[in-house]
């Protein structure tokens, strides 16, 4: 019978790589570098929304506030499916509705909602609105998500309802009403319409 020596395994991990590098924030040397990074993330967001089925035709919009010009935001153009959006498709729009960069038409509803939301909430750098099948279905109930599952608990005291939906949003006054109904929350359920979420990044 062979003699077996006990193994000695070093269990001292020392500093984990996560503590050394994983939590460092990337520093950008210019607003242009930061903008490019955010545009890449915005396009990735559209692609992910499409991949997970949060899109419906060409409806819905995701925006982010420009890092240099705070009264401007980037948005998807009218008529391009989320799965097809490229950086070159994105539009830079000011709060007056003027397309400052890009050569496609802006979605009127996207402008009406997001321009007022970004104006009312300086802490919101990004906002996403979709007509996902389940989000739209749930929105027809006109109620908040109950904190009954681990997933829905993430929305506890962070959501509100807008129950005055009257069709496609075409006026900034309705955008003002949506921003007002959102208040200081992160998510608003647009009754019979869909979901709108906000964030700092």
Residue ranges of each PLM-predicted region?
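Glycine-rich flexible loops
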Residues: 2-201
